[in-house]
C-alpha cells in the first residue's frame, strides 16, 4: 500500500481548504463576531427585529420567510416578527425592520427601491431565479436606517436568497431529513457588499422519488403521517422545503403501487404550489399520470394504445385539465405499466416507431387543448429509457421544442449524448441519472456509492452537449443518498464551480460544513477510502 508523506498530506489539505474557502467566501455575509460597519441582527441588547415582506408576495416566498423566522429561532432563540406594511405598528416602533425581502415582479417595496435607484433593475429584470443580497440605507418610506435586502428576479430567485441567509446563519438544508445539528449563537451580524447570484446552469433541477417500498413509504406511514398511513402532503412539504434549500425546483413524486399516487391526494399538488415546486413525472408516466397505480384495467380496459387509444387519451386529458393551473413539466411517453415495454416483442420496429409518434402527437394535442398557451412554450420532456432508446434510434421524430432527457445506464454512465443535429434543437436536452437503482442485473438501494468524480465526468459531458434544460436524479427513497443528491443539485445549479480536481473533495467538504472544519482531514480519509472501495464493488453486491 502506497504511503503519502505527512508533508504532502498537509500541503494537499491546505490546498483543499483554500479551494473550499474560495468556493464559499465570495458570498459570505453573515458573521457571529461584531466588526466595524456591520449591521446588527441579534446582540445581547438587540433581541428582536422585524422582517418586511409584502402580502402581495408569491405564496412560495411567504412560505420561505416563515421558515426563515423559525431558522432564526433555531440559531438565536428569537423569532423575528413578520410585517407587511412599512407603517405597520411594531415595524419601526420597538421591533425594527432589519431585513427586507421581495420579488422583482411582485413586491411593491422592490419596485420602490428600483424607482428610487437604490436597486439596479438590470440584475433582476427578465432573469431566471437570480437573487441579490445587499444592505440598503433608508430603503422605503417608514423604514429608517440600514436593512439587509434580499431581492429576487422571480419567486424562486427570492426563495433561494432567503434560504441562503438561513444557510449562512447555520441551518443546513439537511437539518430535518438528516438531523444535522444547528449551532446556537447569541450574536448575528451582517456585512453584505452586494452579492449577485448566477443564473442556474440547468433550468429544471430535481429528484425522482423511487423504490419507496422499504424506506420512505413505511416510515411515513408508521411515524410521520400515521393518520394517512402513507406518503402524503406533510411528507411532500418537507421534501419540497429540502429541494428549495438545495436550490432545486423540480420533483417527480413516488409512483410505486405501494404508495398512494400523488394526484390521488388533492392536497399534494397544493403543497407543491405553495412551495413553488415545478411538478413532473418519471419517464414511464405520461402527462402526470401514475399508470402503475392509477390505471385500472378492470374499469378502464387494457393499458394498450393499439387497442384502447380513446380511453387512454380521455384519462390523460383529464389529468392535464385538472393540473393546468400549476407549474408542470409534462412527460411525453408510451410504455407499459410500471416501467415495462408496451406491446409484444414481435411487433416490427417500424410499427413501434409509428405507434409512439402517434401517441406523442395525441399527448401534445391534449396539452394544447387544455392549456391556454402555445404548446411550444409549455415544458415537455421525452426520456428514451430502456427499449424506448432503440425506438428513438430507429427514426422516431420529435417536435423540436420537446426536451430529450438522456438516461444513464442505471449505474452512472451516460448511454447517449446529443449529437450535432440534436444540439440544434430548441428544446435542448436533459439528464435522467441514477444514484439509486432497483432492477437487473443488480440493485443498489442500501445507500448511494456513486463516485463524485464519475458523476462530474458524465454530467459535465452531458451539459456540454446541450443538456441544460432538465436534470432529474433517481434518488430512491432519498435516505442514504444525501451526499449524491446534494452534489447532483449543486452541479445543476452551478456546473462551472466544479472541476475534475475539486469534485473529489466534495464529500469531505460537505461533511465539514455540517460537523466542523476541524474534522476535514478525517472526513477526507474516510470518504476517499470508502468511495474507492465501493467503486470496486458496491456493498449490496458483497
Residue ranges and their predicted role:
Residues 1-28:
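Bacterial Sec-dependent N-terminal signal peptides
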Residues 25-199:
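Contiguous, structured surface segment used for ligand recognition
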Residues 48, 154, 169-171, 330-337, ...:
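Aromatic-residue-lined binding/catalytic grooves and analogous aromatic/hydrophobic interfacial grooves
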Residues 55-66, 152-156, 230-234, 262, ...:
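Soluble non-cytosolic domains of exported or imported proteins
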Residues 60-63, 67, 71, 157-164, ...:
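Extracytoplasmic/secreted proteins, especially bacterial periplasmic and envelope-associated proteins
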Residues 82-84, 182-190, 256, 263, ...:
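Gly/Pro-rich turn-and-neighbor structural signature
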Residues 119-306, 324, 381-384, 396-413, ...:
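Feature activates predominantly on carbohydrate-active enzymes
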Residues 193-197, 294, 334, 363-542:
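Substrate-binding groove of N-acetylhexosamine-processing glycoside hydrolases
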Amino acid at each position: 500500500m502506497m504511503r503519502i508523506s505527512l508533508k504532502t498530506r498537509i500541503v494537499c489539505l491546505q490546498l483543499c481548504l483554500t479551494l473550499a474557502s474560495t468556493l464559499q467566501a465570495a458570498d459570505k455575509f453573515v458573521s457571529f463576531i461584531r466588526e466595524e460597519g456591520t449591521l446588527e441582527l441579534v446582540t445581547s441588547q438587540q433581541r428582536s427585529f422585524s422582517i418586511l415582506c409584502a402580502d402581495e408576495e408569491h405564496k412560495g416566498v411567504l412560505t420561505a420567510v416563515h421558515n426563515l423566522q423559525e431558522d432564526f429561532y433555531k440559531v438565536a432563540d428569537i423569532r423575528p416578527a413578520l410585517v407587511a406594511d412599512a407603517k405597520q405598528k411594531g415595524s419601526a416602533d420597538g421591533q425594527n425592520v432589519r431585513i427586507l425581502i421581495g420579488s422583482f415582479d411582485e413586491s411593491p417595496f422592490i419596485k420602490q427601491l428600483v424607482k428610487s435607484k437604490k436597486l439596479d433593475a438590470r440584475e433582476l429584470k427578465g432573469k431566471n431565479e437570480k437573487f441579490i443580497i445587499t444592505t440598503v440605507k433608508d430603503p422605503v418610506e417608514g423604514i429608517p436606517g440600514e436593512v439587509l435586502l434580499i431581492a429576487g428576479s422571480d419567486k424562486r430567485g427570492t426563495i433561494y436568497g432567503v434560504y441562503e441567509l438561513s444557510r449562512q446563519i447555520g441551518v443546513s438544508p439537511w437539518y430535518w431529513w438528516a438531523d444535522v445539528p444547528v449551532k446556537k449563537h447569541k450574536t448575528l451580524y451582517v456585512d453584505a457588499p452586494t452579492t449577485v447570484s448566477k443564473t442556474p446552469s440547468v433550468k429544471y433541477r430535481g429528484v425522482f422519488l423511487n423504490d419507496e417500498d422499504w424506506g420512505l413509504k413505511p416510515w411515513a406511514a408508521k411515524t410521520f403521517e400515521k393518520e394517512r398511513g402513507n406518503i402524503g402532503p406533510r411528507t411532500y412539504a418537507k421534501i419540497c422545503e429540502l429541494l428549495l434549500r438545495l436550490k432545486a425546483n423540480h420533483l417527480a413524486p413516488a409512483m410505486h403501487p405501494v404508495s398512494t399516487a400523488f394526484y390521488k391526494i388533492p392536497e399534494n399538488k397544493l403543497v407543491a404550489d405553495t412551495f413553488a415546486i415545478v411538478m413532473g413525472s418519471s419517464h414511464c408516466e405520461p402527462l402526470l399520470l401514475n399508470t402503475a397505480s392509477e390505471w385500472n384495467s378492470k374499469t378502464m380496459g387494457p393499458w394498450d394504445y393499439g387497442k384502447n387509444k380513446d380511453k387512454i387519451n380521455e384519462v390523460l386529458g383529464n389529468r392535464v385539465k385538472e393540473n393546468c393551473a400549476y407549474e408542470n413539466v409534462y412527460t411525453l411517453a408510451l410504455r407499459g405499466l410500471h416501467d415495462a415495454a408496451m406491446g409484444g416483442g414481435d411487433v416490427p420496429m417500424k410499427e413501434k416507431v409509428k405507434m409512439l409518434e402517434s401517441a406523442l402527437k395525441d399527448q401534445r394535442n391534449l396539452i394544447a387543448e387544455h392549456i391556454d398557451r402555445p404548446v411550444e412554450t409549455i415544458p415537455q420532456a421525452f426520456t428514451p429509457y430502456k427499449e424506448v432508446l432503440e425506438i428513438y434510434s430507429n427514426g422516431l421524430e420529435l417536435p423540436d421544442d420537446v426536451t430529450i432527457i438522456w438516461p444513464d445506464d442505471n449505474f452512472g454512465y451516460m448511454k447517449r449524448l446529443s449529437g450535432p443535429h440534436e444540439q440544434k434543437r430548441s428544446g435542448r436536452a436533459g439528464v435522467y441519472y441514477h444514484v439509486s437503482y432497483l432492477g437487473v442485473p443488480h440493485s443498489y438501494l442500501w445507500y448511494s456509492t456513486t463516485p463524485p468524480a464519475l458523476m462530474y465526468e458524465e454530467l459535465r459531458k452531458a451539459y456540454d452537449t446541450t443538456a441544460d434544460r432538465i436534470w432529474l436524479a433517481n434518488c430512491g427513497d432519498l435516505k442514504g443518498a444525501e451526499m449524491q443528491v446534494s452534489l447532483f443539485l449543486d452541479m445543476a445549479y452551478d456546473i462551472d464551480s466544479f472541476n475534475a480536481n475539486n469534485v473529489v473533495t466534495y464529500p469531505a467538504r460537505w461533511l465539514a460544513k455540517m460537523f466542523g472544519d476541524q474534522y476535514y482531514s478525517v472526513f477526507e480519509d474516510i470518504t476517499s477510502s470508502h468511495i474507492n472501495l465501493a467503486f470496486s464493488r458496491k456493498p449490496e453486491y458483497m
